[in-house]
A protein has these predicted regions:
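Short phosphate-binding loop-to-helix
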Residues: 3-48, 56-60, 64
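Cofactor-binding loop segments of dinucleotide-utilizing enzymes, especially the Rossmann-like FAD-
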Residues: 1, 52, 81
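Conserved core of the sugar-phosphate nucleotidyltransferase
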Residues: 27, 32, 55-149
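Catalytic donor-sugar/metal-binding loop of nucleotide-sugar-dependent glycosyltransferases
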Residues: 135-155, 160-171
């Protein structure tokens, strides 16, 4: 974190927080930083965390997440995106030995049109009921809902290639 980033939103009516040094490292997790933040703030009904590295999340995406929490459908909501690869066709390689991870390859189930789709957190937002988060220290449980973000808006900027791709979307 740096002053330049922090000052970029100085004119907005939002509460800003600078992470302590131990949460501003490549090995620090977002979850650890959020749990520390929960300990520092006065409690609210819900807690929402929007990652600046995923800038193309829309207001409608955020509203969908908030609605799920308000309707008491869940304890937490996470922005999700479809994984483009067919995970069931994944293999491990040991030297030159191919080791299928799933049994699809051994059973001949290789047509990706008939294989279940998988999703992952998009990096856009994490929302949860305050008390649930304090007690469980995690956003994922049996009562977690997802808001699916289309791949075009699920750009999680972590590398130079990600920056170039994001720039190509706005220029």
């Amino acid at each position: 974190d740096c002053d330049k980033i922090f000052d970029a939103v100085a004119d907005l009516d939002v509460e800003r927080h600078i992470r302590p040094d131990h949460h501003a490292t490549v090995s620090a997790t977002v979850l650890d930083a959020m749990m520390d933040l929960l300990d520092e703030l006065e409690p609210y009904e819900t807690f929402s965390y929007f990652l600046p590295t995923c800038p193309f999340i829309s207001p409608d995406d955020i509203k969908k997440g908030i609605t799920k929490l308000q309707n008491r459908q869940c304890d937490s909501v996470v922005s999700m995106t479809q994984i483009p690869e067919t995970l069931q066709l994944a293999c491990l390689m040991s030297e030159d030995n191919v080791l299928p991870v799933f049994d699809n390859l051994e059973c001949g189930l290789t047509n990706s049109k008939f294989i279940k789709k998988y999703y992952k957190p998009s990096g856009g937002f994490y929302m949860g009921l305050w008390n649930y988060l304090k007690e469980n220290q995690n956003f994922f449980s049996r009562l977690t809902k997802g808001v699916i973000i289309p791949p075009a808006r699920s750009v999680d900027i972590n590398t130079i290639e990600d920056i170039k791709y994001a720039e190509s979307m706005i220029w």
